[in-house]
């Protein structure tokens, strides 16, 4: 029996891969858009996450969803709020968390299957250098992109079947796959907590 993947989720994965609004590492936008995507691969349900990775994948995704729950409530002005204490905007935190996860996993997946591009959407690190990818997006839209990153990671997780938790994954500096998955969980929780602290600042926009 063939299982069908929801159309909205198909579009999420496809849009993430062709990256019409940003270039992938080492490729122009035109080349990224030309990456072949087989319709049958998208229409079929994704292969399950390898059993030995399920627990830590679930933990990473749960942390992402907790973060989405916080961002989803924010308006576009709140997402772009620049704290007087010089810390990052909530939008930077959303882009940074999703960007790091996407880059690390796409590096690994590309090493295992070169048809999958390396995707680097990481924002500049320093607040003064930061330029948002979508300055008009509200928190719901940023949360949807964060979910698409999780969808991408889960869809191609079958490539990790022969990599054990204590093994060093290819093409990254991470000492083990376990270390990467646990750090992604911590990363979401830490940055989300930093965003929540901004709500108590006197200049936080009330909307």
Provide a role label for each language-model segment.
Residues 54-57, 61, 143-146, 150, ...:
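Short amphipathic alpha-helical segments with heptad-repeat character
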Residues 41-51, 135:
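Acidic/histidine-rich, surface-exposed loop or edge segments in extracytoplasmic proteins
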């Amino acid at each position: 029996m063939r299982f069908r993947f929801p159309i909205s989720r198909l579009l999420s994965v496809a849009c993430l891969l062709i990256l019409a609004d940003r270039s992938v590492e080492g490729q122009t936008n035109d080349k990224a858009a030309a990456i072949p995507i087989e319709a049958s691969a998208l229409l079929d349900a994704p292969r399950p996450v390898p059993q030995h990775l399920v627990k830590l994948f679930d933990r990473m995704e749960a942390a992402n969803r907790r973060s989405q729950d916080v961002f989803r409530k924010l308006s576009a002005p709140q997402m772009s709020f620049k704290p007087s204490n010089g810390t990052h905007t909530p939008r930077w935190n959303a882009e940074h968390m999703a960007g790091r996860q996407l880059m690390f996993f796409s590096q690994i997946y590309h090493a295992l299957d070169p048809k999958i591009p390396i995707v680097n959407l990481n924002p500049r690190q320093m607040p003064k250098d930061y330029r948002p990818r979508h300055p008009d997006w509200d928190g719901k839209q940023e949360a949807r992109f964060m979910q698409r990153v999780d969808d991408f990671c889960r869809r191609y997780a079958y490539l990790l079947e022969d990599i054990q938790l204590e093994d060093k994954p290819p093409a990254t500096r991470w000492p083990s796959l376990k270390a990467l998955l646990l750090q992604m969980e911590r990363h979401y929780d830490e940055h989300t907590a930093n965003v929540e602290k901004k709500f108590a600042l006197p200049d936080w926009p009330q909307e």
